[in-house]
Amino acid sequence: MVAVNQTGKAYYGFRPALDLSASILDPQALFAAYKARVVADGGSIPDEPGCLARFGFLVNNGMYSRATFCAAPAFGLKVDGAGNVQTVYNLLGAEGDLIAGSQGTPPLPMTYDATARAVIIQITSSGGWYLKSRTNLVIHKGSTYLLAGRMSDLYRADNNGITAGYNLTGLPMAYLRTMITNGNTTTESWRYGTRDSAWPAGTGGAIGVATSIYADYVPSAGLFKVAVGVIEGYEKGKLLAPSVPSATGKLADLSSYTTPMLIGGTQLANNIVSACYGAFQDMLCLHTADESDAILASRLGM
């Protein structure tokens, strides 16, 4: 018997050959389906070649089946007639699409900067706009998970910055923050953080890893090692620093929780989103990951 799989050659066995084409991920087919969904919803893809390349990156590196969220304004967004951002689309499905939300009186519209390929987000004490996923998302399944992204702090004379991540019980539980503060007391292109395993019985201790140098849109990734209580920070393909190990020996286990992805500030216990002023360019979340994923993800945008 001659067994041939997807070669185009005749099969001479006693049973028909298995057609595995439906189970083989094809970046071009995934992109075509995604584009059809975006266009049908009234959106557009400013950078179609880049979007297709991102599907290729996820598929070819074995990340597609482990990704819960992947979005970049240049890879899909919808704006209204005045240019206000309504939606930033999730490459992994509509449930993760980022929908515009607001509180109070926003100081300025939330718009897309085509040059920076980023959405500008500001929230003050008076109000503002933010982006929040359509539904709750899985944060992690394995003992190690990953966040990666690129953002920019747009005003260096305040103490705000911009945060992307998952919030539970009024706390940022898995997040990326970019911040440079007045007087340069904080200069972080990226900070990845969570709480230790004393949460949820208590608030838990804050665990974080950050760079001490600021620049806009720096490619980075945070590898959250739940079982050993450490976050590893990667930048441009290299491990830059690990966090101080948690006092409990583990990070907070979020595997039984789902919550929206929020980009802007932190959603507090009263459901108010905290102040921010920055720009969001790209974000990727893997529910299960390892060091090789962090190396690759921290090079996105280079």
Predicted features and spans:
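Extracellular glycan-interaction surfaces
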Residues: 101-125, 136-138, 146-156, 172-250
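Exposed, interaction-prone regions of secreted/extracellular proteins
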Residues: 156-163, 171-172, 262-265, 280-282
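A structural signal for beta-strand register positions
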Residues: 221-223, 267, 284
